[in-house]
Regions:
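Conserved PLP-enzyme active-site core in the AAT-like
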Residues: 160-329
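A short linear hydrophobic-aromatic micro-motif
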Residues: 402-406, 438-443
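Conserved PLP-binding catalytic core of the aspartate aminotransferase-like
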Residues: 405-433
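Short loop-beta-helix segment that forms the pyridoxal 5′-phosphate
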Residues: 115, 133-166, 213-216
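PLP-dependent enzyme catalytic core of the Aspartate aminotransferase-like
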Residues: 446-481
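Active-site C-terminal subdomain of aminotransferase-like
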Residues: 270, 295-402
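Short Gly/Ser/Thr- and Asp/Glu-enriched loop/turn motifs at secondary-structure junctions
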Residues: 146-148, 183, 408-413, 445-451
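N-terminal entrance/gating region of PLP-dependent enzymes' catalytic architecture
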Residues: 2-148, 435, 439, 468-473
Length: 481
């Protein structure tokens, strides 16, 4: 397309796209090189960006240079820099250049992979990469596509939990709830430390938050199986229908590891669907020495983990596995006439539209494929081990300082700690650190006490970043206590 023709059509000409694309790659590479110069937590006030934007959209198209100038002037000040090596908040959402390139290619191809027929490579690469991960994480063979189960990429673990809940609901009611709705008797179970998405899933699925039982935890904040069993018995005695339990490998607050094997025994005794949410800590199973966290996963009906947290694959990318794919498909499949095609009717292909809530789906497998091929299992293990090593080093400094204490055992790469002076002091320490822009921490409450969380998992975080963070924490504590 000539420049004149592109101008008449309002499209960007291929030559300009080539030039701007190279500029964008340079900008992203430069951003990563200078990311430490920005305050980690955005310092803007609510409404600041909108006040700087024009009230109406432009009538005439604007130049790419003008857009990028506004990125620097308006957007960057409003960014919290998740890819900063000084980002220690929440759980990581790390990234890598191979993943970014895979995402770019996915956007460039511009496909919609709802059916095998709408892009066979999208479906088959996803199936294959998910099978690779079964081997890489030593997951049960039943989760591979060669057996009765299989894997699919969801957007987040929240969607995986909802899909698991729906499949369990339909298995428990022999598909009646899909036709007639819920009757209020179904009851689901998880721990008090489980992710909030379980409550949202219970609401969406028609189970109701009042029918989601939060089981108490032990001193390490892991679910207590004996309390689960007792609650199930009470619910049955009261005319309820227990049908689903979610165990967690790496709880959001403290990275606690639920005793999956014992929970699975309770689930099987009572005929419940067991879902295992390993959103954060599933990646640890790349390393044989950390596979103790997954003891009992072979007994689960479904499982998920997030490469977009700790496997250098940009958001969003959650890997969801089921032992029996037929149960998932029966719960979610709807086939209108306009989606019928010979490949689907042959029964020889996978249509991932039946494995998720939406119809449409992106080509997420490309970026995951790029990441695995670039790093190899060896490279991924190296970084996981390094992050765990850094976290354990940080935990040792906390133990050695009489002003601080650990709030929970640190099994992997999250350290929960607090100053001994109490909640107000810890809140002030965190607020001062975050306002400084030097690093970013978040908090939780454990044992009803405010607790600081040091989450180590960004792609570029090294020992000197963790050392500096610890020094800054001690400095702020000394300034206020």
């Amino acid at each position: 397309m000539s420049a004149d023709k592109a101008k008449r059509s309002f499209h960007m000409a291929p030559d300009e796209f080539r030039r701007r694309g190279k500029e964008m790659v340079d900008w992203i590479a430069d951003y990563y090189e200078r990311v430490e110069t920005f305050p980690v937590l955005s310092q803007v006030k609510p409404g600041q960006l909108r006040a700087a934007l024009p009230a109406q959209a432009p009538e005439r198209g604007e130049s790419f240079d003008a857009m990028m100038a506004d990125v620097e002037r308006l957007i960057l000040p409003g960014i919290t820099h998740w890819q900063s090596p000084n980002f220690f908040a929440y759980f990581p959402s790390n990234n890598s250049f191979p993943s970014i390139l895979g995402e770019m290619l996915s956007a460039g191809l511009g496909i919609q992979g709802m059916l095998w027929a709408t892009s066979p490579a999208c479906t088959e690469l996803e199936t294959h990469v998910l099978d690779w991960l079964v081997d890489m994480l030593a997951l049960p063979a039943e989760f591979a596509s060669s057996g009765p189960g299989g894997g699919v990429i969801q957007d987040t673990a929240s969607s995986s939990s909802l899909c698991a809940l729906l499949a369990a609901r339909e298995r428990a009611t022999n598909l009646l709830t899909n036709e007639q709705g819920c009757d209020g008797r179904l009851v689901a179970y998880t721990s008090t430390q489980a992710h909030s998405s379980l409550e949202k899933a219970a609401k969406i699925a028609g189970i109701g938050s009042a029918n989601l039982r939060a089981i108490e935890v032990d001193e390490s904040f892991a679910m207590r199986p004996e309390l689960l069993s007792a609650q199930i018995a009470r619910d049955r005695a009261n005319g309820k229908t227990p049908f689903f339990v979610c165990a967690t490998i790496g709880t959001t607050s403290s990275n606690a590891i639920d005793p999956v094997r014992e929970i699975a025994a309770v689930s099987r005794e009572h005929g419940l669907w067991l879902h295992v949410d390993a959103a954060m800590s599933g990646t640890a199973a790349l390393c044989p020495e950390f596979r103790w966290t997954h003891d009992g996963v072979e007994l689960a009906d479904s499982y998920c983990f997030n490469p977009h947290k700790w496997m250098f694959t940009n958001f969003d990318c959650d890997c969801f596995y089921v032992r029996d794919r037929a149960a998932l498909i029966r719960a979610l499949s709807v086939l209108p006439e306009y989606l019928r095609n010979r490949a689907t009717e042959s029964g020889a292909v996978i249509d991932y539209r039946d494995w998720q809530i939406p119809l449409g789906r992106r080509f997420r497998a490309l970026k995951l494929w790029f990441v695995i091929r670039h790093y190899g299992v060896e490279g991924l293990r190296h970084h996981v081990r390094r992050h765990v090593e850094l976290a354990q080093q940080f935990a040792s400094w906390v133990r050695a300082d009489t002003s601080f204490e650990l709030a929970a055992p640190p099994p992997l790469n999250l350290v929960c700690f607090r100053h001994r002076s109490g909640d107000e002091a810890n809140q002030r320490i965190m607020d001062r650190l975050n306002a400084s822009g030097d690093l970013y921490l978040t908090h939780t409450r454990l044992g009803d006490r405010l607790t600081l969380r040091m989450s180590i998992g960004q792609s570029q975080t090294e020992l000197h970043h963790v050392e500096r963070a610890w020094q800054r924490i001690r400095d702020e504590a000394a300034a206020i206590v």
